[in-house]
């Protein structure tokens, strides 16, 4: 979630996020994390307030377990494998474009990182360092960065790569899946996923809007669609995935915090969706749709003459690629 959330998260996770621990796919680094510090104590305190984040009747952001992965859909398994921690937020592997392995996250996560961190994939048991930041753009709260991948892991990642669904508009009621490292009821930042009945698109409209976080709102606006997915601090940078096709259709960026009692009733949510209530623009979670990411980056390629040639060609390959 957005700038306000990242401020807290980057503090919470610094003790573990920047440790020199690494591994490759299938050969994870199993050294223990450090003992609890003041920052991890802060994480635990924040995590106890999960009710502030809940949308609908139940908190649906649940740990991803080996048992779940053994019976989950291929779309779910793929999404879990490509999701990583990245500093105080989340990132996800998109694919290899013009010879570069690209990850996506939020602008507000990347702006605080400066390519210092590792992308740590819990399910794959691998960690890859940031090599280059291609850019981060506040109006879509999106960032692209390149990771260094050893040759031995190329084949593994190639099978998992999936670009955004750039050409498909969102539809109200479209079922979603979000997987990230939010800390609500999760102070250890395990991988958690939400695919409950409320996690769906509530608006086929896209609006430029500010951050509705009442605790610590961010300073800029981003193009947004409303959704009912449970997300918390630490989920910043998570892909928003079509639950049926497995295609990334956007990226989370913020949400109303704390949630109102009305937004914590699934029956009320159903009524808001049915009637197109204006409350969906005040009370829920908000993501940036893939269609708007494509539109804005196309404009940047046309207008930003400061981009180096390699970045331009990589962005062009990213925007032109289709699944």
Roles of regions detected by a PLM:
Residues 1-9:
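Bacterial N-terminal signal peptides that target proteins for export
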Residues 8-17:
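Bacterial N-terminal signal peptides
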Residues 20-97, 211, 310-323:
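Protease-domain processing segments flanking chymotrypsin-fold serine proteases, especially trypsin-like
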Residues 28, 48-52, 56-60, 66-67, ...:
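Functionally engaged cysteine thiol sites
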Residues 31, 217-222, 240-323:
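C-terminal subregion of chymotrypsin/trypsin-like serine protease catalytic domains
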Residues 65, 107, 136, 294-301:
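Residue-level recognition of alpha-helix boundary/capping or hinge positions
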Residues 73-88, 96-97, 104-224, 228, ...:
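Serine endopeptidase catalytic core focused on the charge-relay Asp
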Residues 92, 238-239:
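A residue-level detector for well-ordered beta-strand positions
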